[in-house]
């Protein structure tokens, strides 16, 4: 079933609001490479509870960053596993938004910040947990 433009816009606003929050985070090592960035984002991600999850679910987010490690503009969901139900997709969109909130203002090195500022970056989150029997 297709979602209305209003539903999509509302979810985008939720993602934007959560991702721009200045939530405190644990001290992290400076991020100097794309591999470091991916590891930092994955460390912030907590998949939905098992009862709301789907084994193998994938969700890809398109985002860009400022030089200082803050998100630039609002991130967009560009892919979600097709076989998931709308409730499962929603649970994963919320989990990704919360991950971006937890990762608000990443500690980029000056060189890395200069290199990636304003550039599009995609990150795919994969739920590789196994569903209990």
Region locations from a protein language model:
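N-terminal signal peptide c-region/cleavage motif recognized by signal peptidases
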Residues: 19-22
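Conserved "boundary/linchpin" sites in short secondary-structure elements
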Residues: 25, 39-46, 62, 66-83, ...
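Bacterial N-terminal signal peptides that target proteins for export
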Residues: 1-10
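Soluble non-cytosolic domains of exported or imported proteins
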Residues: 28-35, 86-94
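Short, small/polar residue-rich loop motifs at catalytic or cofactor-binding pockets
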Residues: 55-60
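N-terminal targeting leaders that direct proteins to extracytoplasmic destinations
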Residues: 1, 14-17
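Charged, well-structured alpha/beta interaction segments
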Residues: 48-54
């Amino acid at each position: 079933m297709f979602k209305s433009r209003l539903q999509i816009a509302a979810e985008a606003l939720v993602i934007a609001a959560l991702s721009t929050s200045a939530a405190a985070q644990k001290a992290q090592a400076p991020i100097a490479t794309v591999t470091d960035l991916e590891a930092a984002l994955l460390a912030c991600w907590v998949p939905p509870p098992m009862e709301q999850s789907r084994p193998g679910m994938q969700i890809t987010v398109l985002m860009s960053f400022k030089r200082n490690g803050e998100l630039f503009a609002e991130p967009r969901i560009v892919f979600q596993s097709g076989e998931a139900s709308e409730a499962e997709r929603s649970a994963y969109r919320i989990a990704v938004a919360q991950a971006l909130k937890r990762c608000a203002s990443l500690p980029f090195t000056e060189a890395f910040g200069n290199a990636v500022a304003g550039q599009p970056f995609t990150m795919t989150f994969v739920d590789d947990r196994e569903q209990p029997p």
